[in-house]
Curated annotation (Swiss-Prot):
It comes from Dehalococcoides mccartyi (strain ATCC BAA-2266 / KCTC 15142 / 195) (Dehalococcoides ethenogenes (strain 195)). This is Trigger factor. Its EC number is 5.2.1.8. GO terms for cellular component: cytoplasm. GO terms for molecular function: peptidyl-prolyl cis-trans isomerase activity; protein folding chaperone; ribosome binding. Involved in protein export. Acts as a chaperone by maintaining the newly synthesized protein in an open conformation. Functions as a peptidyl-prolyl cis-trans isomerase. It is found in: Cytoplasm. Disulfide bonds: none annotated.
């Protein structure tokens, strides 16, 4: 085996390896012993077919394809181990070049490299947000809608109504959506079963069917719907309208027995909103700091780190989407418009930012020795379990499990690192230092 080509660019090494005929022959023998036990050949018992007959039956090209799994991963690892310059960060990606001669290539991710900028010069301002009466009114309005009841309405359909209806439809003449008693919330932003469907329902009355058509846009995310015409026939069976509760002291007390007046409810909302706004302002402040740290630093990392982070982000987004859309049909319709390629393109910048942020802050933590001591970790476990009562020792044992304790160390490290750089960023702005003139330098020399 010999490495015929090697390149190291950034955090990736690329090698091309040609294997000796003897190595390939040994691999073919191994492959034969593996396959002969599985493949039945007429005239021979399974596992007893002579090798020459077996290879002729299977074909040399097929045998060489099969031998890849038997010898290439091990050969690739050996080539990496023999090269002192290559320190793999993750598993290599291997591709065959040719089978005769037997040549493969591999791309090997290398560890990330971080060179921090002058982070002690970072400065940022923390935003202060005041809660207004209008902000409180908005929250109360949301609470009223959450506590609303739905009452039968004897009038035409309006936006915001909840309907029970019969739907018959075709898509370019083929059956599309057909439901006998479909519940439907009339909302302008709804895209199911077709964009603008809810607007066609406005002013309809119970028992009077209506027929209408909707043309899906040519650039619709679902290729099977793009440009096609959906013909609907809808019959409203029941209309329900939202009835909001009366806003008074009794409503506040019913919402929470701690409140005797509406004013007390409003004060609690103000406090909660202020706390959330302060948290958001802190998060925005820290985002600015981290962005500045990334921008002033030199950070290089292997692509596999972004790919892993991107997969996690997409999985989280899909779970969040599923939790917010209650209707299975609407979830499937929404999901069908989110192609994997589109989602990867949309969330890739976020994945790249998270990787860079993690690497920069991690480097800062080691540079400034911000890794928590055992005593600090123990103190945090004590704080987390102080209200556990009889289960305190059980919970302490849980936090002291290696995996859980490691996660706690990561959390405390991140907390200490952000606190460290927060303190730097809140310091007064640095004053620019004026360069000394030649005349000034001469005067200083004369005074010496």
């Amino acid at each position: 085996m010999k490495v015929t080509d090697k390149k190291i660019e950034g955090c990736q090494a690329s090698i091309t390896v040609e294997m000796d005929p003897a190595e390939v022959e040994a691999g073919l023998s191994k492959t034969y012993r593996r396959l002969v036990k599985k493949v039945e050949i007429p005239g021979f018992r399974k596992g007893k077919t002579p090798r020459d007959v077996f290879e002729k039956y299977l074909g040399r090209e097929k045998m060489l394809d099969e031998v890849v799994d038997d010898i290439v991963p091990e050969a690739c690892q050996q080539a990496i181990n023999d090269d002192e310059e290559i320190k793999p960060f993750a598993a290599p990606k291997i591709a065959m070049v040719t089978t005769e001669p037997f040549v493969f290539s591999a791309r090997i991710p290398l560890p990330p490299v971080v060179e921090l900028g002058d982070y002690k010069t970072i400065r940022a301002a923390k935003e202060k947000v005041e809660i207004t009466e209008e902000n409180i009114d908005t929250v109360i309005d949301q609470v009223l809608h959450q506590r609303a009841t739905w009452e039968k309405a004897e009038r035409p359909v309006k936006m915001g109504d909840m309907l029970l209806m019969k739907v018959e439809s075709t898509l370019n003449g083929e059956p599309y959506l057909n439901r006998e008693d479909m519940q439907y919330s009339v909302r302008e932003e709804a895209i199911y079963p077709a964009p603008g469907f809810g607007e066609h329902l406005v002013d309809m009355v119970v028992g009077e069917p209506k027929e209408f058509s909707i043309v899906f846009p040519e650039d619709h995310a679902r290729a099977e719907l793009a440009g096609k015409t959906a013909a609907f026939k809808v019959t409203i069976q029941e209309i329900r309208e939202e009835k909001l509760p009366e806003l008074n002291d009794a409503f506040a007390h019913e919402l929470n027995p701690e409140f005797n007046t509406l004013a007390e409810l409003r004060q609690r909302i103000r406090e909660n909103m202020q706390e959330r706004q302060d948290d958001q302002a802190q998060a925005k402040f820290e985002d600015q700091i981290v962005e500045a740290l990334i921008k002033m630093s030199k950070i290089d990392y292997p692509e596999v780190m972004v790919e892993t982070e991107l997969d996690q982000i997409i999985e989280q987004q899909l779970q969040r989407l599923q939790s917010t859309i209650k209707s299975p049909e609407e979830f499937r319709a929404t999901l069908s418009q989110l192609s994997p390629a589109d989602m990867q393109q949309r969330y890739r910048p976020l994945a790249e930012q998270r990787v860079a942020s993690s690497l920069a802050l991690g480097k800062l933590a080691t540079t400034e020795n911000l890794i928590p001591s055992d005593e600090e970790v123990d103190a945090e476990i004590e704080r987390l379990t102080q209200d556990s009562g009889d289960k305190k020792e059980e919970e302490k044992a849980f936090y002291n499990k290696p995996d859980t304790r490691d996660r706690l160390i990561q959390l405390l490290t991140a907390r200490k690192t952000m606190a460290f750089i927060d303190e730097i960023a809140l310091q007064p702005a640095l004053e620019a230092v004026e360069p000394k003139s030649d005349e000034g330098e001469k005067t200083e020399e004369a005074d010496k």
